[in-house]
Amino acid sequence: MSMRIPQGELHTQLRAEAIETRERIAAIVRPLDLAQLNEHPEPNGWSVGQVLEHLCVADGRYEDPLTALMGRSRQDAGAPAREWKPSFIGGMIAGSLLKPKPLKSPKVFRPGPTPRNGVAEELLARELRFVKAMDDAALYDWKALRISSPALPSWAPKMNLGDGFRIHVVHLTRHSKQIERVAAKL
């Protein structure tokens, strides 16, 4: 994905990837029973359920700040045609998530030892809401609106809204590969 792109194109790309990734995750996790979701085939790795829980926790940390940002911001009909580019911090976060190298999850996003009941359907429902939120935000200026990362201290620079959407999709796609790998070992 180019680092400079019209916002409308970024929206289209992120939307397509989010939907495709959600469907891929659904196809993998829906056939799994509770024991399989909680099984740890990799001794030091997360179970499929913990990966799903991690994605739910991370999404939940962005939910209220995004709702508040959208509530206090104005729509801008010209925004989809304007160039979007990542902020410095947003580009760094997305870039690190795009690399295949294993990363430690920030403490604030770490799942507990046991995922919530119905974690698979919870994540799939959250992903439907994410696509709707992104669609609802299409007429806002993603480069101008700023949002904090819950993984960073409050004094850290804010990223732009497009970064938030991009990081969410890159993060989901990254973990879909982990889910696929772990589920294949069950």
Model-predicted segments: where are they?
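Short, contiguous pre-domain boundary segments
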Residues: 2-3, 7, 105-114
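Amphipathic alpha-helical coiled-coil segments
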Residues: 18-22, 123, 130
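Amphipathic alpha-helical coiled-coil segments and their boundaries
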Residues: 7, 11-14, 116, 161, ...
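A short, structured beta-strand-centered segment in the mid-to-C-terminal lobe
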Residues: 111-123
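Short, contiguous alpha-helical
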Residues: 38-93, 128, 132-186
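A structural motif
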Residues: 93-107
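Extreme N-terminal tail/first-helix region
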Residues: 1-19, 23
